[in-house]
Amino acid sequence: MPNRRRRKLSTAMSAVAALAVASPCAYFLVYESTETTERPEHHEFKQAAVLTDLPGELMSALSQGLSQFGINIPPVPSLTGSGDASTGLTGPGLTSPGLTSPGLTSPGLTDPALTSPGLTPTLPGSLAAPGTTLAPTPGVGANPALTNPALTSPTGATPGLTSPTGLDPALGGANEIPITTPVGLDPGADGTYPILGDPTLGTIPSSPATTSTGGGGLVNDVMQVANELGASQAIDLLKGVLMPSIMQAVQNGGAAAPAASPPVPPIPAAAAVPPTDPITVPVA
């Protein structure tokens, strides 16, 4: 008898324990099944630096460093990418000719004779009637100078046809040498070192391995270095070197101001010599 009671008690305790363990699991399963879908989370991604961002990063670092000293750099359109883009929206005739010239799509709107030939005026004999032709006028349309040499203009009599050498400011003399380009200065076309380079030479590659975005200059050299180091490393290197160098240059410029030299003492005036009376010598 006691064994039966113990079995029943153990069975009841086992059932209660199983229910206590299974009830939370069942609750979470039912809750997850009845819960609506979660809202998608929006993550902000930052675009990695690329090689094309190097000129913009360089100009922004320069503008931030120079703005502290009151120097503002104007924006450069070629670096910001704000080029003039021509689309077909400004000129409808380029994309849809029918919007500007209806005669191209519907010829009957402009010339009724193309659709209804009977509308054109037909007068039989008006153009081909005999006797209606005009007699030719002798001499009309002919150049008298071709038959009479005396009517032609002599050579040099018309000053408006030619300009003597030296009278036209736009034309130089025969032996004149232009002095706009200094001799011996090779960095640029006009003797200056270009900063942004020549945009007309942008399609010429500097080497088979690397290509440049300009025709030479400081930015072109920086772009070539960036191709070798990588965009991110080059930007970090410029930011780490550019700002300290600017601050150090400004501090050295202020500290290197020469001190004022002491004033030169005035030269003392020479002592005045008293005048001497002439010696009178008696004459014998």
UniProtKB/Swiss-Prot annotation:
User: Hey, what's the signal peptide range on this chain?
Assistant: 1-22
According to the UniProt record, one GO cellular component term is: extracellular region
Q: What is the effect of changing residue 256 to V?
A: In strain: MT103
Ranges in the Extracellular compartment? 23-252
Instruction: Name the domain of life this protein comes from.
Output: Bacteria
Question: Region annotation Disordered: residue ranges?
Answer: 80-216
- sequence repeat segments: 92-96, 97-101, 102-106, 107-111, 112-116, 117-121, 144-148, 149-153, 154-158, 159-163, 164-168, 169-173
Q: How is this protein situated with respect to the membrane? A: Single-pass type I membrane protein
Q: What does this protein do?
A: Surface-exposed protein required for multiplication and intracellular growth.
What protein am I looking at? Exported repetitive protein
Q: Which organism is it from?
A: Mycobacterium tuberculosis (strain ATCC 25618 / H37Rv)
The gene that this protein is the product of is erp
